Design a protein with these regions (language model features):
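Conserved active-site and cofactor/substrate-binding residues in soluble primary-metabolism enzymes
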Residues: 8-12, 32, 51-58, 82-85, ...
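Accessory "access/gating" subregions that flank catalytic or transport cores
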Residues: 164-300
């Protein structure tokens, strides 16, 4: 940061920045993550605070529209200086010097560009640094993670309702008033979603009809458990915080996606160039740490619910391990539970790794 570069070398510097930083390691990121990263970088440039040539914007759009995705190694970024290495691999493809994923195959970038009538980018002053400096990769991956987490949450809510229907639980655990007493918006919303899903269900029991009608009989025990197991009854309290975590992550990631995450930042209106740290990735990384914990909570809930479903002495409804064949001869889903435990255990042990 102390060396003065002569005007004659400024364009060469842009190429050197990209080539020297294209040294990531590991497997390539999925195409969807690379696409999200490229879109995030394009959005940054559209803020017109990076000082790049319009050709940079055009070629990023051309790559996206033609579904050309640079091969980007997954290891190398630490976030403190943005996604330098991963973004350099994207930039290397834009100048036609890398491999890309194109139409289901890995081909040289120049070959894919020629097939689509795209001319390799000629770098000008500022272009190389702007292409490599920012949080586009972590933001793009974060948005993909967010979409998947929202999908998982939707499945978790539906599966929880179905499980309660299978064992004919009482429905008051999802009552509007009960969950509003807790005040948390996420819990209230999950309970509302559950009520909407089972609005026409005939499988759930009404507590007032069975316990408060005065017709409970003289037996020492009730026919059905007064309070179902936690994995059935505490769904709003478990998935409510998950929903709020996802919503907060979405807020931060959308802000980051639309932000100017470059450095330096060029402000033509003020006639000023700011040197700062907008490339720093803590906003995204902290939200991803929290999102991983939330996803772990969903896996733990699913494992406990399946454990309940598989054990006839607990659910008092289904055969052991949902074995619909001949006991002893058939095994049902017994082995599946072992697989579930194995899959969920690492996430419980290291939920933010």
């Amino acid at each position: 940061a102390q060396y003065r570069i002569g005007d004659a070398d400024l364009n060469s510097l842009q190429y050197n920045i990209i080539r020297s930083h294209s040294c990531g390691a590991g497997e390539a990121l999925p195409d969807i993550c690379v696409r999200a990263a490229m879109l995030a970088r394009l959005q940054t440039f559209l803020n017109a605070k990076s000082g790049v040539h319009p050709d940079v914007v055009r070629i990023l759009a051309d790559f996206l529209n033609n579904e050309i995705y640079p091969l980007v190694p997954r290891h190398g970024s630490v976030g403190a200086s943005g996604d330098l290495l991963q973004l350099a691999h994207i930039a290397l493809a834009l100048i036609g010097e890398a491999e890309v994923s194109f139409r289901g195959e890995t081909v040289p970038a120049a070959e894919a560009m020629a097939a689509c009538g795209i001319t390799p980018l000629r770098l000008r002053i500022r272009d190389g640094l702007a292409l490599t400096n920012g949080t586009a990769v972590m933001t793009g991956i974060g948005l993909v993670n967010l979409a998947q987490a929202r999908r998982l949450l939707g499945w978790a809510v539906k599966a929880s309702v179905m499980l309660n229907e299978i064992v004919e639980s009482y429905d008051d655990f999802m009552a509007g008033a009960l969950n509003e007493y807790k005040l948390h918006a996420g819990q209230i919303e999950i309970a509302r979603q559950m009520r909407a899903i089972c609005a026409t269900s005939r499988r759930l029991r009404k507590r007032e009809a069975e316990l408060y009608s005065g017709d409970t009989g003289a037996a020492p025990t009730f026919r059905h458990k007064v309070q179902p197991y936690y994995s059935l009854r505490c769904i709003p309290q478990i998935l409510g915080p998950v929903l709020e975590t996802i919503s907060q992550a979405e807020k931060i990631l959308v802000e980051e996606f639309n932000a100017v995450d470059d450095n330096p930042v060029v402000d033509p209106a003020a006639g000023t160039i700011y040197h700062g740290g907008n490339f720093h990735g803590d906003y995204v990384s902290l939200e991803m740490d929290k999102l991983k914990i939330a996803v772990t909570k969903m896996t733990m809930l699913a494992e406990r619910q399946l454990n309940y479903l598989f054990h006839d002495r607990i659910n008092e409804t289904l055969p052991p391990f949902v074995n619909l064949g001949k006991l002893g001869l058939n095994y049902g889903l017994q082995a599946a539970q072992l697989s579930l435990i194995h899959i969920s255990e690492p996430t419980r042990r290291t939920p933010i790794s």
